[in-house]
Amino acid sequence: MSLAHQVLAVNNDLPIRTDKPVHSGKVRSVYWLTAEDSARLIKEKGYNVAADAPLAIMVISDRLSAFDCIWHAEGDVRGVPGKGAALNAISNHWFELFRQNGLADSHILDIPHPFIWIVQKAKPVMIEAICRQYITGSMWRAYSKGERNFCGINLEDGLQKDQKLSELLITPSTKGILKGVPGVPEVDDVNITRADIENNFAAFQFKQKSDIDQYEKLLKEGFNLISGALEELDQIFVDTKFEFGYVTDASGNDKLIYMDEVGTPDSSRIWDGENYRNGKIIEKSKEGFRQTLLSHFPDPDILLNKDRMPERQALAQDNALPIDVFMDLSSTYLDIAEKITGQKIVLSENPKQEIIDILARDFDVII
């Protein structure tokens, strides 16, 4: 089977029984199960949720998203081999560590296949919850231009690129475009301050103002737990993005939980510890691919300037990247996943058929 067929690039066309439109994200697709199938599975599987809780099947793909665009390689390769399985394996590992250490729950109820999560519907908080332990990326770009206030946080003079910060910083941005929020521009992923959130907590979908403290607590707890585990592997947890939402438990209580993936090479920067101590940055995340793109094209401003999005989308659509770029990134994903989980990531020959077979046999949701 060709490489193009081994990757799961299209994941929104599975014959899963649903009475709602399939939600297709940059990497994952979400199939909302019917009320009947949700209730049946909750009873059959013993999921610890309300009897009438809506369930969904979340299917990850191997697609490669960067700078808000989907990229492809020569030979019509439209995904990175092993990427989806690696991301899910890492998230599953961290969520299990969270559970063992008494942290908040996630929306994941079951993991029947490396590409599949059975999830409970959650109401998302409209914040990209970003934590930073080092000054790099967009924070460094702003700082190097003379900005000393970032997301409402005052930064001292004299900081150097990639140095460790004196404390863990929370630098949130909006999740999508929020309209009608005083002081918050109506653009995607715009930086915000804690004061913005406090003054408009309902607009960000917090149920109560005190939940802001809870989200920051969960953010720091999750970051510190992953950072400590990576430190034991001589890997540096540089920064990351968490997402949060509310679910209703079996007793009818609303609770704030972790959503989506955590601590992955897609949502985080991870550096090799030994090389960092020797003054060299070796990326163990998608950040390496982003840097490759910035050097690959003659005008990197297209990738960084949100006002040039049509040009950026055309760039991604019209340019097949060298296959070596995708294979190098595949090695990065698989290597860090195997290092974190301690287990080899087994690649599927035909992931789509495997998914269909399991969902038919064990869940009876294939039409």
From Swiss-Prot:
Coiled coil: none annotated. Its EC number is 6.3.2.6. GO terms for molecular function: ATP binding; phosphoribosylaminoimidazolesuccinocarboxamide synthase activity. CDD domains: SAICAR_synt_Sc (cd01414). Gene3D superfamilies: ATP-grasp fold, B domain, Phosphorylase Kinase, domain 1. Pfam families: SAICAR_synt (PF01259). Keywords: ATP-binding, Ligase, Nucleotide-binding, Purine biosynthesis. GO terms for biological process: 'de novo' IMP biosynthetic process. The keyword Cytoplasm does not apply. One of its GO terms (cellular component) is cytoplasm. Signal peptide: none annotated. The keyword ATP-binding applies. Pathway: Purine metabolism; IMP biosynthesis via de novo pathway; 5-amino-1-(5-phospho-D-ribosyl)imidazole-4-carboxamide from 5-amino-1-(5-phospho-D-ribosyl)imidazole-4-carboxylate: step 1/2. Transmembrane segments: none annotated. It catalyses: 5-amino-1-(5-phospho-D-ribosyl)imidazole-4-carboxylate + L-aspartate + ATP = (2S)-2-[5-amino-1-(5-phospho-beta-D-ribosyl)imidazole-4-carboxamido]succinate + ADP + phosphate + 2 H(+). It comes from the Bacteria. HAMAP family: SAICAR_synth. Belongs to the SAICAR synthetase family. This is Phosphoribosylaminoimidazole-succinocarboxamide synthase. It comes from Saccharophagus degradans (strain 2-40 / ATCC 43961 / DSM 17024). The gene is purC.
